[in-house]
Design a protein with these regions (language model features):
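N-terminal acidic, glycine/proline-rich low-complexity segments
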Residues: 1-249
Length: 249
């Protein structure tokens, strides 16, 4: 069984939360080096807090969480509170995190990790706008050749967009960052809306999480119930697409 050294770059988001929990529940497959927060679904102040809330929910206070870029490279931040609620994790109430935020900036952590590990041994799982990753590539171009691969949720090929008729949210928020990453030469696995709109939740699956009777199971059920209302209203689907967990899977 392959064991992957991973940095998760994220803007939590209920579906980001499920993705992070999946990674934390897979220690035999994933060696999680750290979680880097970026502004996206909600502002950075909330995404870095949400990342720590998720780790504490899983009982993983040992995970290092880093705060990154608070706005896109060249434009104003667009957020998605209309989907994720004002906190980004609306749907259930969880306590303010007690675990510390790391002092080093997320961009510097990405650079440090890539320069101080054997080349092409680190996978970056990108769940949000690509601002942190592109900023690392710009700040120290040496790291580009050291990335094993990037698996990212973003874009839409034949599927309609989820922020404009043509655009997917993560790419739309920072297209300049996306251009840097897509033109970098790093091996990319892109998971667009064409894929994630086929990975839908269902009442049966949501209730299976709730039936676990654990804090994680309850939170996942409540988050999913909140999150799926947007897609039910917009697309008429029977459940919500689990965009970001597809990256970890």
């Amino acid at each position: 069984m392959n064991h992957h050294r991973v940095i998760i770059d994220t803007d939590p988001g209920q579906d980001d939360a499920v993705a992070i929990l999946l990674a934390l529940a897979s220690p035999k497959q994933i060696d999680l080096l750290g979680v880097t927060a970026v502004a996206g679904n909600v502002p950075l102040e909330l995404t870095q807090k949400n990342a720590r809330i998720i780790c504490e929910l899983a009982g993983r206070n040992d995970v290092k969480v880093f705060s990154g870029c608070h706005e896109p490279i060249e434009r104003k931040l667009v957020t998605a509170e209309h989907v994720h609620g004002k906190t980004g994790l609306d749907g259930t109430d969880l306590p303010y995190p007690q675990m510390p935020l790391q002092e080093i900036h997320a961009v510097d952590f990405i650079i440090h990790s890539l320069l101080n590990n054997p080349t092409k041994t680190i996978t970056i799982c990108a769940l949000g706008p690509l601002t942190n990753i592109a900023s690392a590539f710009k700040k120290d171009p040496r790291v580009v050749a050291r990335v094993k691969n990037i698996i990212l949720m973003g874009g839409a090929y034949f599927e309609v967009g989820n922020i404009t008729p043509a655009a997917e949210f993560n790419i739309f928020v920072d297209p300049e960052a996306a251009k840097i990453v897509f033109e970098s030469g790093v091996v990319l696995t892109v998971i667009p809306l064409d894929v994630t709109h086929k990975a839908l939740t269902s009442v049966k699956r949501v209730e299976a999480f709730r039936a676990l009777g654990t804090p994680v199971g309850k939170a996942v059920a409540e988050w999913t119930n909140f999150f799926e209302r947007f897609d039910k209203e917009k697309y008429g689907s029977m459940g919500a697409p689990l965009h970001d967990p597809c990256v970890i899977a």
